[in-house]
Amino acid sequence: MAGVKERAVLVLEDGTVYHGYAFGARGKTVGEVVFNTAQTGYQEIMTDPSYHGQIVVMTYPHQGNYGVNVYDMQSNRPWVRGFVAKEFSRVASNPRAQQTIGEFMEFYGVVGIEGIDTRALVRKIREGGVLKGTIAHASLFGAPDHAFTQEELEALRREAQAWTDIDGRDMTPEVSTPLPYAWPTLKSGRRIVVMDFGIKHAIVENLAALGFEVIVVPGKTPAHQIMALEPHGLLISNGPGDPTMPRYAHETIWKLMGLLPTFGICLGHQLLALAAGGRTFKMKFGHRGANHPVKNLQTGKIEITSQNHGYAVDIDSLKDFRPTHVNLNDGTLEGMAHARYPVFSVQYHPEAAPGPHDALYLFRRFLEEVEAFHGATGLPVEKQRADQHGI
């Protein structure tokens, strides 16, 4: 029927139902329901591999008004399981736009829902923690104006409940590059190997902008293969899922500890802590947004940061690391540095994309660590350390 908005529902695993209207690709999807407080940056959010397995609810009510373009992609496709907003724009008011958000979601098969009470949904997640949920469009049941029955809603609830949890699941093989590759750059300076657990383009772009030669390798790459590339530094990337599950990464990172200047971001921060004998825990609803205040314990300055994580490092479990940054909202650990080695990490995203650039200095700090390390030691010492580590 022309002009009729297609009905849709979001059904949570506890039976809560939110009625709204279909948007994006038509169909059904299941995932972990989380929220993001950023006002803009929906394209970067959808294409961030760290959101793999999740249905993202945007707290800012209006999304899509500036459209979508190829330049803001953070990977080669969207990774969200579903996308939720109070209202999506049908037009793209931006000269950079190449598609509307609706066209983008339809092209890539992203199922969405709009018109629900997103404030009530976010309050529920904040108070009770993240839940699994199912988005379903009415056309699956026969007609765009189909009224969902209690039996249909119960079936959708059971589907959400049965969906495989992110907890206890290694998601690296689903998002990591299958083969090593070199990132295009105009310069050829110190060589950095990036362990890819679901990296965003903006991270690699920041490394290349500093003159690094960047080689991206699969997250499962063992230590001896990384060292065979003769890197001057190591970056451990962001990514989705439970940090305790890629145990092969813990072993690799432990073997490389102290051999190379190392920078961990988000999941990479958690993997570093676990490799060093620390602990992580799942947060109630996580940190996802572009406005999280973090205190730099070394300078006393406050940084407004972009964040996207559902797990955190237990600050009391650190052994060879010292805290360098803490979250001002809940006191959780946001950064750490090794007591002896040029190894440091942050839980947030210094590259932003989307978000503020308060933490871009961390990439230059990494460059300085690399230059200082190789100026003071050189390859023979690295070879000796590698032999000691059995690499």
From Swiss-Prot:
- EC number in record: 6.3.5.5
The positions annotated for binding L-glutamine are: 50, 239, 241, 267, 270, 308, 310-311
- Entry's SUPFAM superfamilies? Carbamoyl phosphate synthetase, small subunit N-terminal domain (SSF52021), Class I glutamine amidotransferase-like (SSF52317)
Pathway-wise, it operates in:
Amino-acid biosynthesis; L-arginine biosynthesis; carbamoyl phosphate from bicarbonate: step 1/1; Pyrimidine metabolism; UMP biosynthesis via de novo pathway; (S)-dihydroorotate from bicarbonate: step 1/3
Pfam families attached to this UniProt entry: CPSase_sm_chain, GATase
Q: Where is this region: CPSase?
A: 1-187
Any GO molecular function: glutaminase activity
Residue intervals of the Glutamine amidotransferase type-1 domain: 191-376
Which GO terms fall under biological process for this protein?
'de novo' pyrimidine nucleobase biosynthetic process; 'de novo' UMP biosynthetic process; glutamine metabolic process; L-arginine biosynthetic process
Family annotation (InterPro entries):
Anth_synth/Amidotransfase (IPR050472), CarbamoylP_synth_ssu (IPR006274), CarbamoylP_synth_ssu_N (IPR002474), CarbP_synth_ssu_N_sf (IPR036480), Class_I_gatase-like (IPR029062), CPSase_GATase1 (IPR035686), GATASE (IPR017926)
Catalytic residues per the record? 266, 349, 351
Instruction: Write out the catalysed reaction.
Output: hydrogencarbonate + L-glutamine + 2 ATP + H2O = carbamoyl phosphate + L-glutamate + 2 ADP + phosphate + 2 H(+)
Instruction: Write the record's keywords in alphabetical order, separated by commas.
Output: Amino-acid biosynthesis, Arginine biosynthesis, ATP-binding, Glutamine amidotransferase, Ligase, Nucleotide-binding, Pyrimidine biosynthesis
For this protein, the record's PROSITE patterns field holds: GATASE_TYPE_1
Among HAMAP family, the record links this protein to: CPSase_S_chain
Describe, as the record does, how this protein assembles with itself and its partners: Composed of two chains; the small (or glutamine) chain promotes the hydrolysis of glutamine to ammonia, which is used by the large (or ammonia) chain to synthesize carbamoyl phosphate. Tetramer of heterodimers (alpha,beta)4.
**Protein purpose:** Small subunit of the glutamine-dependent carbamoyl phosphate synthetase (CPSase). CPSase catalyzes the formation of carbamoyl phosphate from the ammonia moiety of glutamine, carbonate, and phosphate donated by ATP, constituting the first step of 2 biosynthetic pathways, one leading to arginine and/or urea and the other to pyrimidine nucleotides. The small subunit (glutamine amidotransferase) binds and cleaves glutamine to supply the large subunit with the substrate ammonia.
| Family named by the database record | Belongs to the CarA family.
Its protein name is Carbamoyl phosphate synthase small chain
**Which classification does the entry list for the species?**
Bacteria, Thermotogati, Deinococcota, Deinococci, Thermales
Q: Which gene encodes it?
A: carA
